């Protein structure tokens, strides 16, 4: 008997139940008589929100000084898994220095709508990118002996009524869009805990959803860790235990502990189920205790430099007519309070108390830049007086270049509520338009956690998207504006022209009881590219101060089967005069003719550093899963036999290379034949196709010999026949004979 099982055997029922809930907001319970310690967990994901006095889970009370790293909206835009892992390592070391056993992150909910108030804490609209980046973060943190808690499992894609709303989603969209990031992280990086979400999923709370917490998470994905509730997400504690929820957070006053004891005593809860939950909780507790390393020292000054370096890799250059990088000899005007007081993080449970913050104005002053400053609009609201506008215009007119620092005030986007529009504050849009009348050289720097409408984008000289870049955002901004660093971030989400273009527009945020995911699998670029909806900036977009050329695409084979791994290689070259990094992106397109698939899906990416004139070969691998969609009839991933296209590019709307492969699968879709089964379904199945081909042979021969019939008309006729069900044979042959045919076909399928 191992240590934990032996401890459980010595526990009273009440002690077992007690371990299934927290001691307070941040600690697990201890049992002194058995030498079971308490361990601490704190909010992340982009820093430590450790509270030592009054505690809460919403970021209301003060926390210890820590380093605030860029939020996920920024780090995902780096497209750099190594950078994400290094950030995780640094966060893990900071946790060790503060005696914290678990960091509550990463957050991998898909950015379904740009209005979600918590989008700044999430990684991407694309599950592949989110999964890769989350896995790297988890590896980094846990390499330091600190646990993680990937969240919020699952479909917590809005803040409106997040604690009671039911996310109504198809099985296919669940599997293709909303679960893969969790699946990737669980299988590849084994987070110590998984945090279930507040909301319902198709009518059942996530904290009580056995299909989600046990059937998928544990049985399908093989997860061995602990499932913890979001703070206050438990509704029926006994049902939650039975579903697979191990640890309730925070402390519920002992009420739910007593419910567990009562359920066991009354025979409504098998004590073995409770024992399993206790074992998983103790695995977390003892891992935290045994892997605590007080020798690890975290230096905040060093970590601040890392935060600034990371943000430098994350910022996205959206527009540039050549004005950037700025010449240090030019007189530059900084306009907008964000230049002095940047918005560097979001509101809510992830809110960090930074030990320092460097603004762009600070950084310019430290380097002796020729910069004047006009505050003129507040970062806290949507207000600007005529006097403030006049001063801003004078300042802009007197400069060679005006840099306007715009973005969303914290009150516009935060945990707990959603935005109501994609617009910037009206005063900011007006200021930009007015400055353009007196100053042709206008650069806009954005601080926001989610896409915004940019009606003036075609008029300004450059736009630099900093997102919420952490406490070193000003240093990173200065480096990028003046060319000390080359922008290399790429958008991890699409910027539509307007909110109404977003695929979730008709359904977000629901009717108060439920929110229908009516766009199904067509989220983000999957919708825009397939529907051919013009967008302001595409997924993967981002400019550089240099240029890159692609060539020599090579596939390891022109054919592929279920078990094969295809190697895709190509060359990328820096054809400019500036050192830079290109984010190469690999997409897959299904050319088999299945209508309900996106025109392309991201299945690979890499960030490649290149000196001027340097060329490198990039290689990526593709498996059958990468070609597949989730087939509900099969209950599994399925790629039909046929042609697939490998696309290599700079963004989802900027494909540079492509090549086709032929894929052959041994999988067959399940089929049960009856009078409503179509000829097309039977012709597409290898076991029934010979019988139906023979049956339809006379009809095919007659059509082939018909005089005056064009090939196009013949194809239309073939399609009509394919769509006919077997019941149309009635009248052509006796009904009993049709029944006999159906029986014959089902026998063939059963073989």
Annotated model-derived regions:
Residues 1-27, 663-677, 686, 690, ...:
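Mature N-terminal, pre-catalytic/accessory segment of carbohydrate-active enzymes
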Residues 295-302, 378-380, 658-685:
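Phosphate/pyrophosphate-recognition segments in soluble nucleotide-handling domains
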Residues 668-740, 745-749:
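Compact, charge-rich alpha-helical regulatory domains located at protein termini
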Residues 524, 540, 544-545, 577-579, ...:
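In a subset of proteins, long, contiguous C-terminal domains/tails are tracked
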